[in-house]
């Protein structure tokens, strides 16, 4: 499904060059749930952002179903990102003035799909993540765990092939974080959606199909 080859990423810093990814190679199979672990600064989030086309590599390639995603135009990348990749971040990034249902619908609305077409899908997803009774609550009326469940529902609305989750439990207490991870594991199995999750939590990463260890910009 995804092949990362000889990936490097460098940034200019104070007249010098900081290299945060150093020749990364990685294969991700369809339907896997992969945990990426490592110390802060190891390059985990940078790798995730490049796979999701939120950033570009300095050198190297990322192939998605055989296609080099960085040969796409910016517009094609944006469409690819919206249709085929879902994102969950440490902070939920929900729009505070909109309800849980409206937030979950947002990726499809960006694609100019009609609300009456997508609301049943969004309601079903929110029910699937345990929020059937919270559809019309705004983010400020939801707990941290509930906010992240809305974010997961939003990530899945377009039926993406891949969900990229960057420390999705980082702002949650232990019990809530474990429940969220268990929910993503269930969705992975039930839907066959590929999940790549960055986490510092060893207990959670142990539940993944595969653990990818990163250190100093490399997979070790």
What are these regions (language model features)?
Residues 2-214:
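ABC family nucleotide-binding domain
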